[in-house]
Swiss-Prot record:
Keyword Oxidoreductase assigned: no
GO biological process assignments: rRNA 5'-end processing
Record-linked SUPFAM superfamilies: Ribonuclease H-like
NCBIfam families to which the protein is assigned, alphabetical: RNAse_H_YqgF
Enzyme Commission code(s) on record: 3.1.-.-
Enzyme class: hydrolase
One Gene Ontology term, aspect cellular component: cytosol
Name the record gives this protein: Putative pre-16S rRNA nuclease
Organism: Corynebacterium kroppenstedtii (strain DSM 44385 / JCM 11950 / CIP 105744 / CCUG 35717)
Subcellular location: Cytoplasm
Record key words, sorted: Cytoplasm, Hydrolase, Nuclease, Ribosome biogenesis
């Protein structure tokens, strides 16, 4: 799998429609969705990771593909968890693998939905900070943190898209 460079919002933009945002971790995947106008991101769910890197698609991929169908999304935005210096670690490979699997499954279903990758450095930290400000601890809010990080990823994409 080649190294993926983050995409730029607005390039090959599919136009109006919902977008799905994913914060891919090794244990969970946070999921967010935009409104139909592509302006506001909201949390949807946290999906437990079941797919092994070299194994067949698991229930996590099934769930995300189903959400893409349910919301009739026009793009899927996957966060690339790069290191602070911009280099790619093993977590980037996990995100790429999830994006590849979702794209393959959607194509198999006859749906052409682009997978976009966005630099997500610091989104989890921002999500934790926002939840802390709301009085939710890290321990009690792990799955909420993943959703909040997915919202940060997607909202950043949507905001940059609006500026173009």
């Amino acid at each position: 799998m080649k190294n993926i460079v983050p995409d730029r919002p607005g390039e090959d933009d599919p136009g109006p429609g919902r977008r799905l945002g994913l914060d891919v971790g090794t244990v969970r995947i946070g999921v967010a969705v935009s409104d139909p106008d592509g302006i506001l991101a909201t949390p949807v769910s946290t999906v437990a990771r079941t797919t092994k890197r070299r194994g067949p698609d698991g229930e996590d991929i099934d769930s995300i593909v189903q959400l893409a169908h349910d919301y009739s999304v026009v793009e899927v935005i996957v966060g690339l968890p790069r290191m602070l210096d911009g280099s790619a670690g093993s977590s980037v490979k996990h995100a790429q693998d999830v994006g590849f699997r979702i794209r393959r499954r959607l194509e198999r279903d006859g749906v052409d939905v682009p997978i976009r990758y966005v630099d997500e450095r610091m989104t989890t930290v921002m999500a934790q900070s926002n939840l802390h400000d709301a009085g939710i601890s890290v321990k009690e809010g792990r799955s909420v943190i993943d959703q909040a990080a997915a919202v940060e990823i997607l909202q950043t994409w949507l905001d940059q898209r609006q500026r173009r």
